[in-house]
């Protein structure tokens, strides 16, 4: 997905970036970002724009420094409120398990018994709809990773819009935009989780997004 100590790989088969390259409009916005000053610490305009894009109230938008940062933050929150078990997909982004281990959450095969449930739709690396949902979506903290939703070529999401309103939805646009070097992400909180959204906002560092992420 990028360079390592050996530099940029000649052939990279692990990349999760859009194969079509960077989106010209997004790239121009990043290049013109004002890096001489801090962003609005409340990110008022950004939250309003994302809320309008998803047709939700602004309080439901929780900004994050990256998908990985949000994964660690919500794992910490689940642990702090007494959760102890996490359900992971068979094939999944490694930071789900990394964050769980860091915060003492134990893997749980029973999706209906877990306190934190991770799902990716479409799934990576299969590109197929996620399977193995809890019987009651609202019972646990369920995070639906939508990183690859904009790259879906056919088919429909596994959950209806009403069902998605019952879970956390995490987005990291840098992948679909072909700009993986820009670290920025956000989540849409469940419609019933205003206090949880406020708690996760409170756990974020100041200026969680830099100018390029905004």
Predicted feature locations:
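Glycine/small-residue-rich loop that forms an oxyanion/phosphate-binding "nest" at active or ligand-binding sites
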Residues: 67-77, 81, 127-128, 144-161
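N-terminal "arm"/small-domain region of PLP-dependent enzymes with the aminotransferase-like
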Residues: 1-41, 49
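Short, conserved loop/helix-junction motifs that constitute active-site signature segments
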Residues: 80-81, 133-139, 160-164
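PLP-dependent aminotransferase class I/II
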Residues: 23, 169-214
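Short, conserved active-site loop motifs that form the nucleotide-linked donor/cofactor pocket
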Residues: 61, 140, 166-167
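Active-site phosphate-binding strand-loop segment of PLP-dependent enzymes
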Residues: 108-154
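Conserved beta-loop-alpha segment that forms the PLP phosphate-binding cup at the N-terminus of a helix
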Residues: 43-44, 57-84, 94-96, 185
């Amino acid at each position: 997905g990028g360079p390592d100590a050996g530099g940029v790989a000649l052939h990279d088969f692990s990349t999760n970036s859009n194969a079509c390259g960077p989106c010209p409009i997004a790239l121009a916005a990043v290049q013109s970002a004002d890096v001489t000053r801090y962003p609005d610490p409340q990110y008022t305009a950004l939250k309003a724009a994302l809320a309008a894009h998803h047709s939700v109230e602004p309080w439901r938008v929780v900004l994050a420094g990256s998908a990985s940062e949000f994964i660690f933050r919500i794992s910490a929150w689940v642990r702090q409120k007494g959760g102890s078990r996490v359900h992971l997909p068979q094939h999944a982004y490694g930071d789900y398990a990394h964050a769980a281990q860091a915060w003492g959450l134990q893997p749980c095969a029973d999706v209906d018994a877990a306190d934190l449930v991770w799902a990716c739709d479409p799934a990576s690396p299969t590109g197929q709809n996620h399977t193995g949902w809890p019987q009651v979506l609202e019972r646990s903290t369920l995070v639906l990773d939508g990183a690859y939703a904009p790259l879906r070529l056919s088919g429909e999401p596994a959950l209806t819009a009403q069902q998605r309103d019952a879970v956390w939805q995490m987005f990291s646009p840098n992948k679909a935009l072909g700009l993986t070097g820009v670290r920025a992400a956000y989540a849409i909180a469940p419609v019933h989780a205003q206090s949880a959204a406020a708690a996760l906002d409170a756990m974020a560092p100041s200026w969680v997004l830099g100018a390029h992420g905004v």
